[in-house]
């Protein structure tokens, strides 16, 4: 009883976390948003079940269906049944398909396993469920899952799938099996390749009217033998002998959630002959098949993989101005988890790119991780009924603006501070964007080097800067004075690579000011266009003023 209470509390806590993010909509807007998404999902259902085609990725469908259910619960609507069954399925299953309850995490699985024994883990193969009925050693009937009680007659189709044994013997001669028809793959690595819309592809093949050779691209994974041998080992052996070899290969005994987690992670990264979306843990001891009912299986649960891509709600659109003056667009998101990483922001790119994506707050976007774990947008999967886009800032900035602070220069000015403090420039450890904002807000810098004049007392009394950190910052600022001349020139934004600047052998500000365009053009990786940019940069009034100021501070290389 205590275990079930713990599971219930875990589920309620999880549901509470979902309900806590209910949209702040009026009743009228909630009705409109729910109705629009409900109609779209119904259309996808009709396409899937009636025509065997899918205009949406399986993962996107699943997540938008979950989002619809969340909205319905938020605003008191009746949640819809996910994945509506085919309307004309009329063949009774000899044994009902129960479905499988999903565990929210490893802790919930551990609680479920605690009072159970003789447990086994199998891959949750991603395809379409089927019943196989054998009578007198021959395949007598194949039935689609449907609503769990009735389904479509798939006998003709399944008889053309070479991976499905058409004759069996021994205990299987008169048996009912349940399993998954899947798309056969060679070396499928779930972590790298994702779901590839396998479920919809299988459904499409099974729904086609023609009996094409493409059915031989399908396989079957048997996951249940109702009223079969009591021992799992005996079941697996008999199935393998009959030709259902995958079941024996991919069924393992487990004692606890840690063992399940290890197998789950192994299959997530291994080459498999099918697409999976998690694992199923089942007890070898099952009730008699006459007691099986849809939604009432207490002897098995699923622990799904975190999707490679997540549907995330756009909460806000923000604009940032980089040190070179380019405006970039960032989408703030309702938090989602991707590969154990909490993602709350994703870079969209330029204003033009944002306009091409047509993204507004309230939209649902598909987000995944690119190289080095950087979030990226894969698609806009749903746009809200009411869409209001913010106005981007005027494109008045360039590589020669905002060395000096002003109200319109706030973002580019901060970007310049972040750049000069980075490791590759002045190497000011312990301060990032938030720290620079705090310093500038309190002390109102005149220009990008004004921080050199801050005293230990000023740093110590800066809101947002811990007192224990202020002494470290003052030390870092003093050390920066001893940085080489080329580092200071880089901090000033000279349009050259470090390699080109080092090759120039410039060691003083006066020497740099007198260098000609021809001199810069001969440096490695510096063409005529870049050389002209250097000339424009060094002749800029703000740059000259900064050079004079650094000279007054006796920074190496700037002295007269």
From Swiss-Prot:
Active site annotation, chain numbering: 124 (n6-amp-lysine intermediate)
Entry function: Catalyzes the formation of phosphodiester linkages between 5'-phosphoryl and 3'-hydroxyl groups in double-stranded DNA using NAD as a coenzyme and as the energy source for the reaction.
MF (Gene Ontology): DNA ligase (NAD+) activity
Keyword Secreted attached: no
Stated name of the protein: DNA ligase B
EC number: 6.5.1.2
NCBIfam families, alphabetized: PRK08097.1
Gene behind this protein: ligB
Record-linked SUPFAM superfamilies: DNA ligase/mRNA capping enzyme, catalytic domain, Nucleic acid-binding proteins, RuvA domain 2-like
């Amino acid at each position: 009883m205590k275990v079930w209470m713990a599971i219930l509390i875990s589920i309620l806590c999880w549901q509470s976390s979902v309900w806590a993010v209910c949209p702040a909509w009026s009743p009228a807007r909630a009705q409109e948003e729910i109705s629009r998404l409900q109609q779209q999902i119904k259309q996808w259902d009709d396409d899937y079940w009636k025509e065997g085609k899918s205009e949406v990725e399986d993962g996107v469908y699943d997540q938008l269906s979950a989002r619809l259910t969340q909205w319905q619960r938020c605003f008191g609507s009746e949640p819809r049944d996910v994945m509506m069954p085919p309307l004309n399925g009329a063949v009774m299953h000899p044994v009902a398909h129960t479905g499988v309850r999903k565990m929210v995490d490893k802790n919930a699985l551990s609680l479920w396993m605690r009072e159970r024994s003789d447990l086994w883990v199998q891959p949750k193969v991603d395809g379409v469920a089927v019943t196989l009925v054998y009578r007198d050693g021959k395949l007598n009937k194949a039935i689609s899952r449907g609503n769990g009680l009735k389904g479509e007659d798939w006998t003709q189709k399944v008889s053309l799938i070479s991976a499905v044994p058409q004759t069996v013997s021994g205990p299987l001669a008169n048996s009912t099996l349940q399993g998954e028809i899947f798309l056969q793959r060679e070396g499928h690595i779930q972590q790298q390749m994702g779901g590839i819309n396998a479920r919809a592809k299988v459904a499409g093949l099974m729904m086609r009217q023609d009996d094409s050779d493409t059915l031989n691209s399908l396989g079957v994974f048997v996951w249940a033998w109702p009223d079969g041998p009591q021992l799992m080992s005996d079941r697996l052996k008999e199935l393998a002998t009959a030709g259902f070899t995958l079941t024996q290969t991919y069924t393992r005994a487990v004692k606890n959630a840690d063992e399940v987690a290890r197998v789950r992670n192994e299959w997530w990264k291994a080459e498999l002959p099918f697409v999976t979306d998690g694992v199923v843990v089942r007890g070898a001891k099952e009730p008699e098949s006459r007691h099986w009912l849809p939604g009432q299986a207490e002897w098995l649960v699923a622990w799904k993989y975190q999707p490679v891509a997540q549907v995330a709600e756009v909460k806000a659109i923000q604009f940032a101005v980089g040190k070179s003056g380019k405006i970039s667009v960032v989408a703030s998101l309702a938090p989602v988890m991707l590969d154990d990483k909490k993602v709350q922001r994703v870079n969209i790119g330029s204003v033009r790119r944002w306009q091409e994506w047509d993204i507004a707050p309230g939209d649902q976007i598909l987000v995944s991780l690119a190289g080095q774990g950087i979030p990226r947008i894969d698609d806009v999967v749903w746009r809200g009924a009411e869409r209001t886009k913010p106005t981007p800032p005027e494109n008045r900035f360039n590589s020669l603006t905002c060395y000096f602070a002003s109200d319109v220069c706030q973002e580019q000015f901060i970007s310049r501070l972040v750049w000069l403090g980075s490791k590759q420039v002045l190497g000011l450890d312990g301060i990032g964007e938030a720290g620079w904002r705090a310093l500038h807000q309190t002390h109102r810098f005149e220009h990008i080097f004004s921080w050199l004049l801050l005293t230990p007392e000023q740093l110590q009394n800066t809101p947002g800067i811990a007192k224990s950190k202020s002494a470290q910052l003052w030390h870092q600022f003093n050390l920066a004075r001893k940085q080489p001349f080329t580092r200071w020139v880089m901090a000033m934004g000279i349009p050259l690579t470090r390699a080109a600047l080092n090759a120039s052998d410039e060691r003083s500000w006066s020497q740099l000011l007198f260098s000609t365009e021809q001199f810069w053009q001969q440096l490695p990786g510096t063409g005529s266009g870049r050389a002209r940019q250097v000339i424009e940069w060094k002749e800029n009034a703000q740059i000259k003023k900064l050079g004079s100021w650094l000279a007054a501070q006796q920074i190496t290389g700037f002295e007269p």
